[in-house]
Amino acid sequence: MAALGQKTVLVIEDDPWTRTITTALLAGEGFAVVEAKNGEEGLKQARAQAPDAILLDLALPTKSGLDVLRELKGETSTQDIPVIVVSAYGTLMNESDAHCAVGVIQKPFDYDDLVGQVEHATARSLEVALT
């Protein structure tokens, strides 16, 4: 549960080590972090938690990150949540998918880039909520 005024980030990442490190980094910067280890769990958490931003790994088992992104952007309850996609394989998105994400981070990611993009995405979430 996020404290009043605290931004919530949903981290959808199948690799336990990467998920743990990412969660620790974001929590250390003052974000409330919700974790999901696969696409289905991530979709459930996004619907239930309505996070301020989502950090989404593209290479997920069973349901790909691109499928998750498309579902998130296709549902009224989640379409305005800013999504930052993460990939170890460079750009795996085509142009039609790229416009759905507010940022792209390549693994291994730079700490400052990760935090900066999440801060930007959560600020964007607030702007959308106020309009």
Predicted regions mapped to residue ranges:
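Conserved acidic carboxylate
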Residues: 13
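Acidic, metal-coordinating helix/loop segments flanking the phosphotransfer/catalytic sites
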Residues: 35-53
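Active-site residues of response regulator receiver
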Residues: 57
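C-terminal output helix
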Residues: 109-122, 126
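Acidic catalytic/metal-coordinating carboxylates
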Residues: 38-41, 64-70
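Two-component/phosphorelay signaling modules centered on CheY-like receiver
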Residues: 16-34
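The feature encodes the CheY-like receiver
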Residues: 61, 79
